[in-house]
Every structure is written in C-alpha cells, then in structure tokens.
C-alpha cells in the first residue's frame, strides 16, 4: 500500500509536465576515425583474437543502467584496453547498434596498436596501453562544420544561448544535456561528457568544444573531442525525453520524497516511465479499440505501415512491366510512391496463416537491422488481400545479371569486383555478429546481391527465407536455399550454423573472380569449384581468373580471394573461417592464413539431376 501511495504521489508530481510523443528527425550521421598505423611487418594473430575478445566483453556489459564500458584484456601481449561511451539518451539497442558499427570500422581499418572512432551516437577507442586518465588531447579534438552559411543576423545569439545552456545543463546533470532555443529560428544542442570525467574536467572539455563550434559558419556542426561530444543543429536530432531528463536537483527531490533507495539512472528511467504511463493511460481506450480492430497489425509493431491501396497504385496494380524479379518469398515490383520516392515492393505468398504469423514475427525482429551493405526494410502492408514488404530501391541490377551476362556492355573491373566482395563480407559479418539478433541468411547467391549506382553491394532477403513454408518450387528436404550454394552439413543433415553462410560466400566469391556460375549438377572437371581446386593443387591458380579482365587485375588480391573461397567451401565446418576472420583477411594485405586442406564439397552428388535447383 505504501509503495502504491508513493507511486500515486509521484505520478501526481510529474503530471504537470508537458511532453510531446513525437521523436525529432535525425540528421545524417557523421563519424571521425583516427587510427594508429598497422605494423605491416608483424601480423600477430593473437592480437586479433585479443581484440575480438575485448570487444565481445564490451557488448556484454551494455545494459539499461550503464551505456558506457571500460574493459581490458591483459593476458595477451600487448594488452588491449577498450572504452565505449554511448549518448545517454540512447536505448540499449541503439547503443549496441552504434557500438557494433564502430567496432567493425575499427576492426577493418585500425588493426594496429590503437584506434578511435567518434560518431553522433557513440565513441569507441582501443589501445595497447591504459588511457583511462587521458581526458584532453588536442591532437584528436576536431570540429566538423557544415559549409552552408546561416544568413540570419540573430542566429549567432540564439546559437550561443543554446550552447551555453546545454553546457551548463550537462555539467549539472552528470555529463549529459539537451537544450533548445526556439525564437525567430530554432537551435537545438546536445552535450555528452564521458562518464570517466569529473565535473570540472567535463566543464573544461565542453567549454573548449563550444569555442571550436563558434568558429563554424553553418546550420549544423559537431565537436568530436577526446572527453566529450557537442552538437548543434537547426533541425531537431533528439527526442523530447532527452531534453526533459530530470537534472540532479529534480532527481534528488524525487528520491528523497518517494524512492530513497533508487540510483540516479533508476530515477530518470522511472520519471520517463511514469510520464509514458500517464500518456498511455489517457489513450488506453483508443489503443484497446485499435488492438481489437487491427489485431493483425499489432503483430508487427516496429514495422512502418503502408496502405495497401497506395502500394497497389505505386506498382500499377503489380503489373508485369513493374516486376523486378522473384525470390523465395515472393515477387518483387518497382513502386513509385505519391511523394516521388522509388521503392521495391515484395508481394508475399504463404501456404497457411501459421506461416504468415511466423513470417511477420520475423519481420518484427529484422526491421531494425541496418547496415550499408544490407537492403533496408522500410515497412509493410498487412491489411490488404496480399501481404507486402517495402524495401529501399536499389537502382542497379543484381550481381548475376551483370557478372554472367555474355554480351553485357559493362564488364566488372577487378577493383569493382574486389570492393563488391569486401562489401558482401562486411554485410554478412554484421548479420552474424553485429546486429542484436544473430541472423543466418541461408540463401547467399549472386541474385541476392543487389548493386547500387556506385556498384556497392547490398544483400537482399536476409532473415526471411527461414520462415517460408514448402511449396511446389521446393524439394521435400525442408531445406531453404539454392543448390550449388548449400553447405553439406545443412543439405544432408539439416544442421544450420553461420558456417552455412560462409560456405555460400565461398562459392560466391569464386564465381566473382572466375566470372563463371557454379552449376550444382555439373560434375567432374566441368565444375567451377573443382576446376579452381585442381588449379590450386597444381600451383596454376592464376588460370582460374576471369579472362575477360585481360590481365587488368591485382594478381595477389585475386589469388588471395580464390584461396579464401576454397577455405570457405571445405566440407568440414571446423575448417571454415568465420566471417570476422574473412573480413580481416580481405582487409589486411599482410594477413596470413592456412591453405585449404579439403577439396570443395560438390552438393549435386546427393541429389537427382531432375530435381529443382531451388530447395
């Protein structure tokens, strides 16, 4: 009863607060990368393993109560020290997402003794020495200014007011603050000090950062400093909860009056939760009605809804002239939305309602997965006669349409092929390790690799194929995927791990280098995989490289990719590298790796030739 009374009093205390439920639009994210150079004369495998261990431990320590982590691995030589600081207004999911993106960048580009990356949402640093006492380092402090001038005479006064307010607020509020000045023009500002800084050092860092931003001439700028982050913009880039976060005095009042046992972060969370509860309670009847009338819609709360009629019109009623292709989950159409945006609309087919429910549960899981080498899911429509998914539109064709076309006008250069291979490896590595939910693609192949205007690869259909039921285009094995790309343990025994994707990736990169498609039913010396293996044994691997390149390629890179491909297609799961190891091998010229020990697995030997190539 006493607890209930306290909660009631607390709700009454916060009821006067007026908060908007909308989230401000985010500006484009920027990042600043600084690296210690890689020692090309000494590649230490234990260094990579130590790095991966240290980063893995950081991910485990990110919680609702703590969005900053100090970690170290000291049983390796040299030791590895890691520090992560996320913005205090981020969710755990967003913090982990930023951490994993930053970690991948450091892993690819900063494999030397140390490196740091600063983005709008988090800061990540690693080094081989303890840097916990380093709060100021002008050599790494930088202000990124937008070039466009403001054109407003009073803007500077409003900007200075916002920067001063947010600095004072952050120092008083444990290192974080958000503020706005809305007059003839709006200015929004956000400040974050690292949690390892005391109040005086935080103030010093933000004052220096503020001085650097005053030299900028634009509507948006950010200061990436060693111990803090400061940003302003004329566009709102944080939500209302960040700006109305209780300061230290308010938290002390709440704690002393109602909950003396709670920590600062618990009080903040309780305040936000109480406000949210008040809003939800007032809208309860309306929400209940929506849930009853749109029960199916509620199954995918994180999926942005598109009206079926709008998508039907955008695709000209799914006319064949708008059809882009067909995958394992359904047909894909080009759509032009009323605002002029071009999207890709996938019209799904299901056998039963059970499969539909399972599928949309999975859509709910993957809707937040975002990476530059993954096709982005924009939303869905689930209330019309057909279930639809809406993806970003990738302007170029799929990789197979460019790579295997005999009379194609454009022959992919070696540089383009190598960049495509790097991008695919990074996208797969993110699915396996970088996203909050591990996703095994199951159907990596050239037709599921889309190319944008710059020929950068984007992986399509990730996370979806595993929810589909069996239909007439599939054999009765119950296995999802495409023959020729299926790993033996998955095809024969149904055992699925991320190494199944590694196998398919190996086939894919061999196809990219050779320019030849792997046919699941081609036996003996006619098989692309077998031919590359034989050339490897005979030390004539260069003869496997696509002759259309006419010698215009970096032989060392091409041979290395083929050897990595052979490592990936070995029958034994244990002998195949992980995608993290593959990314490291591809990114680092001097990386050493074992030679393949087993010939490639030729999956056609376990199936009859008259079966469909899709399972």
UniProtKB/Swiss-Prot annotation:
It is found in: Membrane. Its main location: membrane. It is a single-pass membrane protein. Residues 29-266 are extracellular. It catalyses: L-seryl-[protein] + ATP = O-phospho-L-seryl-[protein] + ADP + H(+); L-threonyl-[protein] + ATP = O-phospho-L-threonyl-[protein] + ADP + H(+). The chain crosses the membrane at residues 267-287. This is Cysteine-rich receptor-like protein kinase 1. GO terms for molecular function: ATP binding; protein serine kinase activity; protein serine/threonine kinase activity. Residues 288-615 are cytoplasmic. The active site is at residue 443. Residues 318-602 form the Protein kinase domain. It comes from Arabidopsis thaliana. Residues 29-131, 137-237 form the Gnk2-homologous domain. One of its GO terms (cellular component) is membrane. Expressed in the whole plant at low levels. PANTHER family: CYSTEINE-RICH RECEPTOR-LIKE PROTEIN KINASE 3. It holds the Pfam family Stress-antifung. Residues 1-28 form the signal peptide. ATP binds at residues 324-332, 346. Glycans are attached at residues 100, 165. Its EC number is 2.7.11.1. InterPro entries: CR_Ser/Thr_kinase, GNK2, GNK2_sf, Kinase-like_dom_sf, Prot_kinase_dom, Ser/Thr_kinase_AS. Belongs to the protein kinase superfamily. Ser/Thr protein kinase family. CRK subfamily.
